[in-house]
């Protein structure tokens, strides 16, 4: 999938949860990405985040930082 599409999707998910407040929106976005995104999609967007994350909204950026931290802790649980 194209990087532009992944950035768009992450931002859209963040906007969906945005009415819950920034902290809850980031948590909801991270949870969605961990549960429903293919591992290859997560790897691609996390590499983009590592390279600066151009185009990512603040909620999506915070959510992806959480996904990144979760993958470092328990990578086997993200694929379930």
How should each PLM-predicted stretch be described?
Residues 1-80:
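Intrinsically disordered, low-complexity, basic-enriched segments
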């Amino acid at each position: 999938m194209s990087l532009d599409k992944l950035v768009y999707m992450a931002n859209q998910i963040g906007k969906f949860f945005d009415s819950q407040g920034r902290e809850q929106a980031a948590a909801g976005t991270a949870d969605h990405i961990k549960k429903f995104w293919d591992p290859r999609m997560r790897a691609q967007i996390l590499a983009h985040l590592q390279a600066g994350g151009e185009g990512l909204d603040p909620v999506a950026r915070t959510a992806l930082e959480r996904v990144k931290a979760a993958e470092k802790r328990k990578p086997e649980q993200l694929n379930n």
